[in-house]
Amino acid sequence: MSGVMGIDEAGRGPVFGPMVVAGVLAPKRELGLGARDSKELTRSARRRLIRALMSDERLRVDLRIVWPWEIDEEGVAKAEFEAIRELVRRAMPDEVILDKPGNYSPERLRRELDLPEGINLIAEERADAKYEVVSAASIVAKTYRDWIVRLLELEYGEVGSGYPSDPRTVDRLRRELRRGGELLKYFRRSWETYKRVESEVKQRKLEDFF
């Protein structure tokens, strides 16, 4: 195939739920849909744009769901790179555009991603605000992660945003650790928040025992 593939992720930082890495393959960088960084859009605006993206015959949308146990096993950076690599190899675009991760040089990033020869790589800070094809990927990733978290809440009850800064999420983690709930598998055990709360719960159980 050919074209430009914008790639972005949602859910890199939360202690709960998956990370979703999305790719949008388009004939060119700009789509003319008015897409911009998903973090700047309301939920209703994201829904409107996701419908437009999914129904646009010029575009091919793909995604990879990275579950918490994968992140715990591989680390978030490696898991993200593997997801990006998978999306690129399925689409084989002429060009890939994504947010520049950390202090990676273009040469090191290309090595880490193991991109096939001939694919042009553009990695820039705030690429999701500069290139509409990356904005579109950002919208897809954010929308799908929100849907997954919502489905989990429908089954297990409120979890909150999933971020370590959300008291609802931390409180739910604490309750699940106390009772060994099934929902625990959707929390990232390698996160400092998980380790801290787990330590608190164990300490409290010891105090209650004595």
UniProtKB/Swiss-Prot annotation:
Top-tier EC class: hydrolase
Cofactor note: Manganese or magnesium. Binds 1 divalent metal ion per monomer in the absence of substrate. May bind a second metal ion after substrate binding.
Protein name: Ribonuclease HII
Organism the protein comes from: Methanopyrus kandleri (strain AV19 / DSM 6324 / JCM 9639 / NBRC 100938)
Keyword field contains Metal-binding: yes
Keywords: Cytoplasm, Endonuclease, Hydrolase, Manganese, Metal-binding, Nuclease
Family: Belongs to the RNase HII family.
Locations listed in the record: Cytoplasm
Gene Ontology CC terms: cytoplasm; ribonuclease H2 complex
PROSITE patterns: RNASE_H_2 (PS51975)
